[in-house]
Amino acid sequence: MFLSKPSVYICLFTCVLQLSHSWSVNNFLMTGPKAYLIYSSSVAAGAQSGIEECKYQFAWDRWNCPERALQLSSHGGLRSANRETAFVHAISSAGVMYTLTRNCSLGDFDNCGCDDSRNGQLGGQGWLWGGCSDNVGFGEAISKQFVDALETGQDARAAMNLHNNEAGRKAVKGTMKRTCKCHGVSGSCTTQTCWLQLPEFREVGAHLKEKYHAALKVDLLQGAGNSAAGRGAIADTFRSISTRELVHLEDSPDYCLENKTLGLLGTEGRECLRRGRALGRWERRSCRRLCGDCGLAVEERRAETVSSCNCKFHWCCAVRCEQCRRRVTKYFCSRAERPRGGAAHKPGRKP
């Protein structure tokens, strides 16, 4: 007997977002509608890319996308309804849609190909739609059925999660790139044909990180929705907010501090960055953000690293390298005595 679609989706996504890297889709999707099983590996890969992007975007934040945050299932994991939960839902939804769209364009699915629905139509002054646009409509439709099926409730929390799932999909569509090819005599560009391509997924992650910082707090009772009137009020409230924006119901906790009840480790012991030509402003200020503003000192530790260097190709056919040792300095947040005049942590500061 086949499982119902929602049951299959819930099984799939709950298992995909476990942090063990040894999972296999085939282990938990042995049955189900065959029409949807063909997408399961793409959904798994998309969910994993969302996890990795979350960790990248928040690597130097007080909340750094910890393992317990990476389950979308309401059966345990994301108990809070704060802006971090909003981001996890959005980036996971975006990752699934992005991967399905990309794999469609690569020809991985027999029932999907380029989006040429607008080919030949005037797109703007001097250019027409043409070529092979990535089929985001397909990726959006399939990912919506997989991801949104996790939400079986009708309360404010479920509405929030569905809204942020949609914001993730909108982020993929909103960051698509227009690529054009010139046509004309002797290399002139009299007219152009253009198509839409997916950006690097890193751009989608950066876009959603900006939305995270601007996330809107919705003032609703989370238990609302048990009555027709309550559900109507929730629906009206969320309809008034653009689906391009992230929303949350609760304020974030103080991520500086350890909180075993919430599963928060605090920032003590976290590594931070101070120097490096390639560092951006956010990374260079990580010691202040993770340590100083949390009432911790910055501890300097020296370590020796070993890496391959002076590699040479020898005919035929081997590459031989030397092992070079290098002393490096790393910085960590420590409970050690702070220098005089250091700022004390102020609870409730923005994470």
Curated annotation (Swiss-Prot):
CDD domains hit by this protein: Wnt_Wnt8b
GO cellular component, one term: extracellular region
Residues carrying lipid (O-palmitoleoyl serine): S186
Database matches in InterPro entries: Wnt, Wnt8, Wnt_C, Wnt_CS
Source organism superkingdom: Eukaryota
Protein modification: Palmitoleoylation is required for efficient binding to frizzled receptors. Depalmitoleoylation leads to Wnt signaling pathway inhibition. Proteolytic processing by TIKI1 and TIKI2 promotes oxidation and formation of large disulfide-bond oligomers, leading to inactivation of WNT8B.
Glycosylated position list: N103, N259
Covalent S-S links between cysteines: C54-C65, C104-C112, C114-C132, C180-C194, C182-C189, C256-C294, C272-C287, C291-C333, C309-C324, C311-C321, C316-C317
Tissues in which the UniProt entry reports expression: Expression is restricted to the brain, and more specifically to the forebrain.
KW Manganese (keyword) present: no
Keywords (A to Z) from UniProt: Developmental protein, Disulfide bond, Extracellular matrix, Glycoprotein, Lipoprotein, Secreted, Signal, Wnt signaling pathway
Keyword Transport among UniProt keywords: no
GO MF, any single term: cytokine activity
Pfam families: wnt (PF00110)
Main subcellular location: secreted
GO BP field: canonical Wnt signaling pathway; cell fate commitment; cellular response to retinoic acid; determination of dorsal identity; gastrulation; nervous system development; neuron differentiation; response to estradiol
Effect recorded for E53Q: In a colorectal cancer sample; somatic mutation
Record's subcellular location: Secreted, Extracellular space, Extracellular matrix
Signal peptide span: 1-22
Function statement: Ligand for members of the frizzled family of seven transmembrane receptors. May play an important role in the development and differentiation of certain forebrain structures, notably the hippocampus.
Family membership noted in the UniProt record: Belongs to the Wnt family.
Protein name: Protein Wnt-8b
Lineage summary: Eukaryota, Metazoa, Chordata, Craniata, Vertebrata
Designated gene of the protein: WNT8B
